[in-house]
């Protein structure tokens, strides 16, 4: 079975419910293929705390993601993170810190990262990415 890790921007689009392409891809791969990581969950929580709607309303919108498997930034991911950063930094092509952590989690677990941030994340070697907003 194909396993995917949802990036924060994809989770936000799922909550908004405005992207037919994302809904279609979820139906195609099945809910069992979806996962998030601790870094994505943290970013979603920050968004809930900063939301103009208020934390409680926004938290109620994102809580469904806790039903998905959630992968931590563990020792294996840390090794991948170190390799990613040490590859990108000398090239002057660093991407965001949390993006590198999310990429490391996906790569360390051989997951496809579903993101709309393909411009930056395509710089990460051996990271499989898909943009379901463009499907």
Regions found by a protein language model. Name each.
Residues 1-36, 46-63, 90, 135:
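Short, well-structured N-terminal submotif of metal-dependent ribonuclease cores
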Residues 1-3, 103, 107-135:
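Acidic, PIN/NYN-like endoribonuclease modules and their adjacent C-terminal/linker elements
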Residues 2, 46, 68-114:
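Active-site neighborhoods of divalent-metal-dependent phosphate/nucleic-acid chemistry enzymes
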Residues 7-8, 22, 44, 81, ...:
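Generic structural signal for small/hydrophobic residues in well-ordered secondary structure
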Residues 10-11, 40, 77, 119-120:
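Alpha-helix capping/helix-boundary segments
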Residues 25, 80, 87, 120-123:
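Residue-level recognition of specific faces of alpha-helices
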